[in-house]
Amino acid sequence: MLPLTAAITAGGASSRFGSDKALALWQGRPLLDQVAAGLAACERRLLIAPPGKYALPGWETWPDTRPGEGPLAGLEVALTHAAPGWVAFTGVDNPALTSDYWLTLLAACRPGMSSVQALHPERGPQPLGALYHTALLPRVTGLLAAGERRLRLTAPAEQTVLVTGLGAHFFQNVNRPADLAELSGRGEESLEV
């Protein structure tokens, strides 16, 4: 088991997708199941979603306490209910994040750091699909109370470890049906670290 709490946020409206993207199929399985499979080895697993909306055996479901306020609000719920330590946090629209991806981030954890994020070769740090320490909870709550919604502000830069060398294919975010079609065209062989 990985010494992490896994957390998937699945409370968005899927407005750009046109239907519930958590249930959209990729490689014959719903996106939610694909994302959960990459995090299956985590000691504790949290699904941030409306109660009763999804069935994910072995996962605790917690409602988004600030619906409509984005992934930062989902992270607040995850940090609140996680075991003390590191949380592997991602969205339902990141199905290419394998267990090897999470192991790579976990190996980069350092004392005194509060986040571990993959560094996209072109777009920089990736705050969704990252590790966050539960010590960040007061900061996240403060950001939300101040009206902030940007996940990238969660951890101070000097407390963030950036992991290089991960392929760009890990960062395919499924927001539209065309994104899912593009991801499907890549196949499984491109999803290794």
From Swiss-Prot:
GO cellular component: cytoplasm
GO MF annotation list: GTP binding; metal ion binding; molybdenum cofactor guanylyltransferase activity; nucleotidyltransferase activity
Parts of the chain that traverse the membrane: none
Entries under Gene3D superfamilies matching the protein: Spore Coat Polysaccharide Biosynthesis Protein SpsA, Chain A
Keyword Amino-acid biosynthesis included in the entry's annotation: no
Positions contributing to Mg(2+) binding: 93
Binding annotation for GTP: 9-11, 21, 64, 93
Reaction(s) the record says it catalyses: Mo-molybdopterin + GTP + H(+) = Mo-molybdopterin guanine dinucleotide + diphosphate
Uppermost EC category: transferase
InterPro entries (alphabetical): MobA-like_NTP_Trfase, Molybde_CF_guanTrfase, Nucleotide-diphossugar_trans
Keyword Nucleotide-binding annotated: yes
Subcellular location: Cytoplasm
E.C. number(s) listed in UniProt: 2.7.7.77
Cofactor(s) needed: Mg(2+)
Residue stretches in coiled coil: none
Gene Ontology biological process: Mo-molybdopterin cofactor biosynthetic process
Notes on the domains: The N-terminal domain determines nucleotide recognition and specific binding, while the C-terminal domain determines the specific binding to the target protein.
Reported function: Transfers a GMP moiety from GTP to Mo-molybdopterin (Mo-MPT) cofactor (Moco or molybdenum cofactor) to form Mo-molybdopterin guanine dinucleotide (Mo-MGD) cofactor.
Family to which the UniProt record says this protein belongs: Belongs to the MobA family.
The protein, known as: Probable molybdenum cofactor guanylyltransferase
Organism (species): Deinococcus radiodurans (strain ATCC 13939 / DSM 20539 / JCM 16871 / CCUG 27074 / LMG 4051 / NBRC 15346 / NCIMB 9279 / VKM B-1422 / R1)
Taxonomic classification: Bacteria, Thermotogati, Deinococcota, Deinococci, Deinococcales
